[in-house]
Amino acid sequence: MGVKLRDVVSPRRIRLEDLRGRTVAVDAANTLYQFLSSIRQRDGTPLMDSRGRVTSHLSGILYRTAAVMEREIRVIYVFDGRSHHLKGETVSRRADIRKKSEVEWKRALEEGDIDRAKKYAVRSSRMSSEILESSKRLLELLGIPYVQAPGEGEAQASYMVKMGDAWAVASQDYDCLLFGAPRVVRNLTLSGKLEDPEIIELESTLRELSISHTQLVDMALLVGTDFNEGVKGIGARRGLKLIREKGDIFKVIRDLEADIGGDPQVLRRIFLEPEVSEDYEIRWRKPDVEGVIEFLCTEHGFSEDRVRAALKKFEGASSTQKSLEDWF
């Protein structure tokens, strides 16, 4: 879910064409959940193969990545590593929501309420090791690079943008700003939504809010993040006001006698000194066409005609570049 900063952060709408020739680091967890939630049958059932294995994520990776790359936008998927121990409560809470949603989904199906069933089905989406491994396998076959983060994928993606290995992070969450991403793109067509992309630039955001990056993190900790509850009754607007008035989170906590749900120094370091890997390779390769056909069509029952049509978009993307070396 991420920190709720929408009330104080103003994204700027852009066109897909504005991203032409750019490289974006895709928050894999965020994007795969979008695929699992949105690519479903009318009653909310995820796409599955003949053996009952979920394939919604594979469909999303193939068709939606193809649509983006056809527009000459290169993508790198960044996967989460081990979860920070302070995120345990958030993970448990989300698991409970998924379990309850799954119960409501099945109940709605039994009652024949398709609309309600689909609403709860979306909330019941869950990640598994099988989904993660099959996603990476497909990316390898497609020639799309991916990076395995040691910790938070958003932190790794943000680091890659800071290092110049990508132009922006593609994610629906605002957490990447806390991790220091210079640019975050929301509503990229990877989500499947017919919305114009939005871009948030960290430097201009801090300038508009008249705060530093550290103060932005402090404000988020007051509101609540995936790693702490925050202070009840403090939203983004009030949090911003308090940080501007007091200067930092320590003075706010002292004056309000508030508890943010953790040690502010430790919580700060999660965002300001995140665990990232400097050892990664980014290289685009030509798709292994027959390997993709074998994996998706033979093993998972995809339509060969549709898969081959999508693969032509990957091939077409490379032909629009000045030379093949620009991509592969």
Swiss-Prot record:
Its cofactor is Mg(2+). GO terms for molecular function: 5'-3' exonuclease activity; 5'-flap endonuclease activity; DNA binding; magnesium ion binding. One of its GO terms (biological process) is DNA repair. Residues 1-98 are annotated as: N-domain. InterPro entries: 5-3_exonuclease_C_sf, Flap_endonuc, Flap_endonuc_arc, HhH2, PIN-like_dom_sf, XPG-I_dom, XPG/Rad2, XPG_CS. Pfam families: XPG_I, XPG_N. Residues 320-328 are annotated as: Interaction with PCNA. Belongs to the XPG/RAD2 endonuclease family. FEN1 subfamily. Interacts with PCNA. PCNA stimulates the nuclease activity without altering cleavage specificity. This is Flap endonuclease 1. It comes from Methanothermobacter thermautotrophicus (strain ATCC 29096 / DSM 1053 / JCM 10044 / NBRC 100330 / Delta H) (Methanobacterium thermoautotrophicum).
